[in-house]
Amino acid sequence: MAAKIRKGDKVIVLTGRDKGRTGEVFEVRPADNKALVRGINIVKRHQKQTQAQEGGIISKEAPINLSNIAIVGKDGKPTRVGFKIQADGKKVRVAKRSGAEIDV
């Protein structure tokens, strides 16, 4: 199955403590059905000291379930994603809200 949310997409959070906030997807984990979004779902982790890195408490993004995020359409509102086959046989993602192509 083709991925509806991909790396580089601008998404909005639908549920949870970050509801309504937007960010860019920088990693997708299809096996876990999760994604990492820049600036969203920030958690604090205790980092052990290594030769290369100093120890302490660091803040980093935790994975968020794909069902809890949606792509932001051209109008700035969340939209569902569908697929359309073009005349040349190429499969593209389209926004269900507006019908506009996402892969431009």
From Swiss-Prot:
GO terms for biological process: translation. SUPFAM superfamilies: Translation proteins SH3-like domain. Keywords: Ribonucleoprotein, Ribosomal protein, RNA-binding, rRNA-binding. SMART domains: KOW. GO terms for molecular function: rRNA binding; structural constituent of ribosome. Disulfide bonds: none annotated. The keyword Ribosomal protein applies. It comes from the Bacteria. InterPro entries: KOW, Rib_uL2_dom2, Ribosomal_uL24, Ribosomal_uL24_CS, Ribosomal_uL24_KOW, Translation_prot_SH3-like_sf. GO terms for cellular component: ribonucleoprotein complex; ribosome. Belongs to the universal ribosomal protein uL24 family. Part of the 50S ribosomal subunit. HAMAP family: Ribosomal_uL24_B. One of two assembly initiator proteins, it binds directly to the 5'-end of the 23S rRNA, where it nucleates assembly of the 50S subunit. PANTHER family: MITOCHONDRIAL RIBOSOMAL PROTEIN L24. This is Large ribosomal subunit protein uL24. The gene is rplX.
